[in-house]
Structures are given as structure tokens and as C-alpha cells.
Amino acid sequence: MKGLFVTIEGPEGSGKTTLIKSLLPYFEQKAQKVMATREPGGIAISEDIRTILHKQEYTMMEARTEALLYAAARRQHLVEKVMPALNENYLVLCDRFIDSSLAYQGYARGLGMDKVFEINRFATEDCMPSLTIYLDIEPEVGLARIEKDAGREVNRLDMEDISFHKRVREGYLQVVERFSDRIVLVNADQPMEKLIEEVVQIIEDKLL
């Protein structure tokens, strides 16, 4: 693996997708081979799994089923899209990766971070990001952003009550502490222009 694998993590409404859309042209202008992708998704099989995971009517989905579907989507996305790009020396910017599963299913769903981590170690064969940016934001602020975004489709996870979203953030903060060697926490409750500047600086300082 020769490229650089950067993942962007955060609760709902933290601004991950908007940030990546801005990072992509910035690094392209620097003559950097760069690719943006997302989880779950990025390729046909994983996008189909994403549709299942996000369907509002699938409220009966059990936590382990959810965790396994995310891991399955992650595996296919990794081998079909991410690894080939890294082997071609790309900078890969990915919206979510294993840390989402640890925070959402491991902590917020109560499955246990260690169990979910082992599922994902099997799925990824221990392929981990070079760097992870965690966008930290209060759940109330993030959910308010989603409500104002008319272009964003509300998914099954968005519909969870506020206590779930608070657990997600608590889980993320534990993940940040556990993997402090590769995760950098950034305050997402700031103007997007400043957020972009801060994240660009972190990526350039640590990796480029």
C-alpha cells in the first residue's frame, strides 16, 4: 500500500460530506492524485447495502445485522475501490470507515467496541487509515443542521432519538482516545471555511 488513506468521521450533521467536496479540488490543484469516496457505498454492491441500511421502514433491523451489513459493505468497497487506488499512490478521502462502526454499533447500539472491532478486523484484514479526522459536534447542533438541509434525504439513523445520537458522540470520543495515534479531533461547530483550512493544515502537516 503506497498511497495515503484519510478518513473523515463524525456524528450526523457534522459536515463530513461538505468538507470532502472542498478537500477534493484543493488537493487536485496541488497535482495530487486524489479520490473521494464514502461508506457505506462507493461501489455498486456497497451502495445497494447502503440503501438497505438507510431505509426508514427497516426499523426492525437488529443491531448485529446492522453491524454485519456495514462490515460487508466495507469489505467490498475496500478491495474493489480503496486498495487499488492506494496501490496507485492515490490520496483517498473516505467519508466514514471502521470508527463509525465502533461508535454507532459498538457503543451506541451496545454491542461492545471490542466485538465490533474484531468483525471489522476480519473485514478489512487490518487495513487502517493513515489519518482520521473526527469532526466533533453536539448532537443537537448536528441534527438541527440536517433539518435545515432540504437537499439531504433523512435516513433510518437520523430518525433515532436524541439519546442515541448522544451515545454516538460518547462512543466517538472513546474511539478518539483509544486511537489517538491516528485520530485528530476537530471542532465542527465553526464556519466551513475555517474548518476546511484547519483540516487541510492537519493533512499536509501529518502526511504530505
Curated annotation (Swiss-Prot):
Catalytic activity: dTMP + ATP = dTDP + ADP
Keywords: ATP-binding, Kinase, Nucleotide biosynthesis, Nucleotide-binding, Transferase
Family matches, as PROSITE patterns: THYMIDYLATE_KINASE
EC numbers for this chain: 2.7.4.9
Keyword ATP-binding on entry: yes
Cellular component GO terms held in the UniProt record: cytosol
Binding site for ATP: 10-17
A GO molecular function held by the record: ATP binding
Keyword check for Kinase: yes
Gene Ontology biological process: dTDP biosynthetic process; dTTP biosynthetic process; dUDP biosynthetic process
Family statement: Belongs to the thymidylate kinase family.
Alphabetical list of NCBIfam families matching this protein: DTMP_kinase
Function statement: Phosphorylation of dTMP to form dTDP in both de novo and salvage pathways of dTTP synthesis.
Matches recorded under HAMAP family: Thymidylate_kinase
Protein's UniProt name: Thymidylate kinase
Native organism: Bacillus cereus (strain G9842)
